[in-house]
Each structure stands twice: as structure tokens, then as C-alpha cells.
């Protein structure tokens, strides 16, 4: 449990996030493109078994907001040509849909506590 100005906030990644981060690693091992060095670091942080920092959680929420449009791209969803697209691979590195909802909720709490 992280303490943000006296407010306890659980910043431990959840199982859905870990599943997506592992999917990212599996895709990369298979030679798929997508994701930056930061994405690789984020997947490692999610899979580490450690809590994320408050700053990382706020950064994650902002990243998902910027990349929401990637979900409309060709190859984002299973069964589409080009799956997984570069955007889908990167989305997984950051924890996927589970990471988006998790980081959005916690980011709001962190910002309120600050």
C-alpha cells in the first residue's frame, strides 16, 4: 500500500494487467513489432510483483488517454488482418484494458491526495 500525503492507495498491479504484460513479452519473443523501450520497462514493472510508484500510475493513465485511438486501428482486435498491430502490442505492455481502468481510477485518487 502506497502512502500519498497520508492517503493509502493500493498500487499493486492486478492479474489482468500481468496477463497483458506477459502477452506483450510473448508477442515480442515471437518477433512482433510494437512498443518502445518505455513499454518494455512498463511491462517489466507490472510483472515484477512490486507496487508501482504514484508517478508511474499517473503516467500510465496519461499514456492510455493518448493511445485510446489505437484501439480503432486495423489489427487491434483478434481476427482482424494484421493482428496484433503495433498499437495492440504496446497496449498490452502497459497492462491492456485492465491497466487502463486500474490506472485511471488510481490516478484520480493520487491527484486528489496530492
Task: Tell me what each language-model feature is.
Residues 1-114:
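Extended terminal accessory/targeting regions
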Amino acid at each position: 500500500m502506497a502512502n500519498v500525503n497520508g492517503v493509502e492507495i493500493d498500487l499493486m498491479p492486478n492479474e489482468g494487467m500481468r496477463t497483458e504484460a506477459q502477452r506483450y513479452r510473448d508477442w515480442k519473443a515471437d518477433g512482433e513489432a510494437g512498443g518502445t523501450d518505455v513499454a518494455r520497462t512498463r511491462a517489466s514493472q507490472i510483472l515484477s510483483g512490486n507496487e508501482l510508484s504514484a508517478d508511474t500510475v499517473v503516467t500510465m493513465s496519461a499514456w492510455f488517454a493518448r493511445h485510446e485511438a489505437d484501439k480503432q486501428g486495423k489489427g487491434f482486435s483478434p481476427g482482424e488482418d494484421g493482428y496484433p498491430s503495433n498499437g495492440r502490442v504496446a497496449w498490452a505492455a502497459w497492462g491492456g484494458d485492465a491497466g487502463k481502468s486500474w490506472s485511471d481510477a488510481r490516478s484520480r485518487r493520487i491527484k486528489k491526495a496530492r
